[in-house]
Amino acid sequence: VKHEITKVSKEFGDAYKGDYAHFTLKEIYEQPDVILRAGETTIEGIEKAVEYIKNAKNIYITGSGTSYNSALIAKQILSKYVKIKVEPIISSELQFAPETIEENSIFIAISQSGESADVLEAVRIAKKLNCKIISIVNLLTSSLTRKGDVVLGMNCGPEIGVAATKSFTAQITILYKIIQKLSENITINFEEFSESISKMIENPKKIQKIAKELKHVSDIYILGRGINYPIAIESALKLKELTYIHAEGIPAGELKHGPLALMDTDVFVIIINPNDSTYTDTLTSAREIKARGAKIIGV
């Protein structure tokens, strides 16, 4: 019996942590390289995915945990840059509302392992409705790979750490590569992205100093607006998974609808506020929090 040979994206040696204290740290430092590699073995796949998306009447995108947060970002960037509407769906919820999906739609499924039971169940429901499946997956020998009409490989190597780090970066990179193909007016410099992350992580002392201050905190709130809101949700998930501290991502504009009542001198708030269209409004939210005595970490 002849079996087809599948080439994996990385070497088995990448499953060793080397001189790093733990795998998560190693995988954080691999992110600059991941940006350059994500999707590089699936250029034809990206082009085919773009054709599906261009001709789609309805597009859904699903995932669990970090992959769902990537789906939320996909909704924002596809709408903003190429005016394409996408509906994110939590994989575990679809079985309770399968009527959400229209027949003959495009269904994008994201999973690092390609073996998440909830994601595979969501794909099963979508295939039953004659949807075309675009699989964004790291493990190219996985069940999700086999179920995809188009497969986009993250190509980020083994992810041993419990918390998704480099695979999240790979997922977002692939989504931006799709956008670049969808629009003739957008040019994205992925090398510049890679260099920016390298600069950010090359001097960890400031981050370590902040981490020591947060060591005994029991609650952390993370705020953001626009595309920074799903980043806040993902940041909160990382804190919960790795530190066992209660962390919550909040849309900064919703601060006055409940969360502001929790702000006092014992609370730490991380505010994601780059110099974009959300900057001024988010700064106003920061002032409201500061007035109640909460400690603020600005990103």
Please describe what each predicted stretch is.
Residues 1-32:
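Intein/HINT protein-splicing elements and their conserved insertion hotspots or analogous self-processing inserts
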Residues 2-6, 142-148, 204, 253, ...:
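Short, functional N-terminal and low-complexity linear motifs
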Residues 11, 90-91, 251:
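Short, solvent-exposed coil/turn linker segments
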Residues 23-60, 150-268, 278:
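Active-site phosphate/pyrophosphate-binding segments
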Residues 51-195, 225, 238, 272-299:
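Glycine-rich phosphate-binding loops that contact phosphosugars or nucleotide phosphates
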